[in-house]
Structure formats: C-alpha cells, structure tokens
Amino acid sequence: VPFTRRNIKADLEDVGSNFDGAPDLEFRLATKALELEQSGLGYQRIPPGYRFPYGHTHEKQEEVYVVLRGGGRMKLDEEIVELGEWDVVRVSPGTWRGYEAGPEGLEILVIGAPNLGEDPRGDVEGRRDWWAD
C-alpha cells in the first residue's frame, strides 16, 4: 500500500504519563503507526504554564516544531523564542531545546528527520533541570 492513514487522537496511544510532571500532558508518537521510513512525527498537548523538566538534544536528527494552538516559549541553547499559533521552528542537530506552555497551553506537531529507527534513544541526550530561571 503506497500510503498509511491514522488519526492521532483515536489511533495513537497517549504516552504523556511516561514523563515526569503534569498529569494533563498528552504525547502521541505516530512514527511506527504511520510506518514512516525517512522521518518521525509526534503530537504534544502541554497544559497551561507547564515547562518540561528537562531539555534534550539530538546527534543526527533535525526537528521541526509546528504550533497548532496556544503559545509559549522555547529555549534553544541559551536563546528564548516566543511561540504563537502557526509558528514553525526548525532545530538543528546538536542544539539543546526545551519548551513551556503559555496561559492557554501549547499544542504542537514535532517532525524529525532522519527516522531514528527502533532505538531513538540512541540519538538523544536529555538533561534534567536544563532550563532553570
């Protein structure tokens, strides 16, 4: 079959509870469900005022973040970037990143390439309390 169709909300498991912190964090990974070969795709709904408790960087993967609803901020290395609805941010491999939702929450699609295969954790380094005020 030359295509795969899935519904992010209905077909993909919410793995948000695997992360520390906010009970209302929603995180759905579409890469395997869509049988993606060259890229990865994820969806996140972050509750108002929540900041991820860690930052992360990738050795090989470039990521694109698309703000679907709400707003917030991203920290990219040492720079803070404001996010609004329909903003798109490309993040190069090797760049540290973290994000927090504004008062309306933050809904984002995350697209990454190349696809990291069966063990995506081999490409990522995370650091707890990376973004401290």
Locate predicted features.
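A short, N-terminal "cap"/entry segment at the start of jelly-roll beta-barrel domains
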Residues: 1-39, 47-48, 54, 121-133
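A generic "binding-loop/recognition-motif" signal
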Residues: 60, 79, 95, 104-105
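Residue-level recognition of conserved beta-strand positions in structured domain cores
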Residues: 43, 76-78, 93, 101, ...
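Short acidic-glycine-tyrosine-enriched beta hairpin
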Residues: 78-94
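Double-stranded beta-helix
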Residues: 3, 98-133
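Short, conserved beta-strand element in jelly-roll/cupin
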Residues: 43-47, 57-75
